[in-house]
């Protein structure tokens, strides 16, 4: 297949502006990504638009046994925007264990349902564990 015909619009969604700015600056210096149509934005900036491929960067991760609340990223309306913008492929980047165990003010952590759905439907979804600074 001709690789030139495999051009996809890619969106990277993150809840926080500071993370958006960091990702934007990192991708701008990588010349190998200039051939791709990549838009990086916050959840709010993707409201009403979609892309072939969406990468949702949850940002949050465990920090030395600290019980963190994830209310901002767990807001169901914002999460709905983040997870419903992909036409062909959705990639969620995050610390799965942390997101599963994190607390929300209303005791309703939507990531529990998302992760359980992924685990129950392994023929449709894939979890890839990657090393990193917070990997255990």
Task: Set out the residue ranges of the language-model regions.
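Short, contiguous acidic/charged loop-to-helix segments that flank catalytic cores in large enzymes
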Residues: 1, 43-46, 68-71
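Conserved RecA-like helicase motor-core motifs
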Residues: 9-11, 28-42
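A short beta-strand element within the Helicase C-terminal
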Residues: 41, 45-61, 81, 89-93
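Residue-level signal for short, function-critical loop segments
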Residues: 16, 59, 96
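Conserved helicase/translocase motor-coupling segment
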Residues: 1-25
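Helicase C-terminal subdomain and adjacent C-terminal extension
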Residues: 27, 63-136
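Feature representing long, continuous alpha-helical segments
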Residues: 17, 21, 25, 41, ...
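Conserved ATP-binding/catalytic motifs of P-loop helicase motor domains
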Residues: 16-20, 47-48, 100
């Amino acid at each position: 297949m001709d690789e030139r015909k495999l051009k996809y619009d890619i969106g990277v969604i993150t809840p926080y502006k500071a993370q958006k700015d960091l990702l934007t600056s990192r991708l701008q210096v990588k010349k190998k990504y200039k051939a791709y149509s990549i838009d990086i934005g916050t959840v709010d900036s993707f409201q009403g638009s979609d892309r072939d491929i969406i990468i949702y960067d949850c940002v949050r991760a465990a920090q030395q046994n600290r019980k963190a609340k994830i209310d901002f990223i767990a807001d169901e309306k914002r999460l709905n925007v983040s997870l419903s913008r992909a036409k062909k492929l959705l990639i969620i980047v995050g610390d799965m264990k942390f997101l599963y165990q994190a607390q929300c003010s209303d005791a309703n952590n939507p990531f529990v349902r998302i992760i359980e759905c992924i685990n129950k439907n392994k023929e449709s979804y894939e979890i890839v564990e990657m090393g990193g600074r917070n990997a255990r």
